[in-house]
Structure formats: C-alpha cells, structure tokens
Amino acid sequence: MRAHGLRRVLLCLLRLLGVVWTLPNSLMGLLLGICVIPWGARPRLSRSDFALVFDRWPWGPGGAMTLGNVIINTAADLEALCPTYAHRAGLCQEPRVRIGSHERAHVWQYMLLGPFFLPLYFVLGGISVRNPLERAADRYALGQGSWWPWQNSIK
C-alpha cells in the first residue's frame, strides 16, 4: 500500500513538472482562447484530457489544436469524431477517432517536450501524415499504442 501511495505522489509531481515545463505553450493557448470568448468560445476544464478546453472556436476549417495544456476546439465538445491523418491521406482505412483522445496525446507530448514541442513539430512535418507526433496521436486515439512517437525505439 505504501509503494502505491509513493507512486501516486511521484506521478503527480511529474505531471506538475510537465505542466510547468510546457507553461509557455499553455500561455499562448490561454491568450488565444481568451481573445475569442467574445465570439462564442467556451472555456472548461477537462480532467480526462488534462487540459483547459476552449470549445466552439469560431474560426477555421474544423477540428482542434493543442498548445501545451490548452485545447482549442471548433466543435461543441471533444467527443466529435475525425479521420486519422493516414486515413485522410489515403494510406489506409481506419475508423474515425475521438478528437479529444487525439488531442490528449498532444497534451502529453507537450508536457514531455515543453518549449521544444512546437519547433520539433514543424521540423518533423507540421500538420501532415509524415509527422510522427501526429501519427502517434492517431495510434493513441485508436487504442493501438503510446502517445510517444518513439516508444518502440526505447528498449
């Protein structure tokens, strides 16, 4: 029982460290979200997605975007289903995924990479099927693997 309690404390501390590490990214997301509240964006905390979510983002083609522990979402909630990047690119047939699960993977990626996430994201291919961060988020949302793109390379 004692080891379980210690493990919970360590996980809590690691999460807190991740939140602090990615705080510059989260502040950008917070500023972005607050700016569009007058146009209909609705903020809420999502414990399951470990993020502050701004639903009903009024602009853009649809979908969601994560900045640190902030998710900007064009839908009414994160339950909306979307195609994976590989499916959209015509590489395979996959079921649609819950957008919140995909974005949660990015939250965890941000918490590990902190201020390096955005530069690395664009170096790895940006918003595309080539980006291993996006492919890992899709696998995670499909329930087929870790949110960490290089999980299999760590042995």
Walk through the language-model features, giving the residues of each.
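A structural signal for well-ordered alpha-helical segments within the folded catalytic domains
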Residues: L11-L14, G18, T22, S26, ...
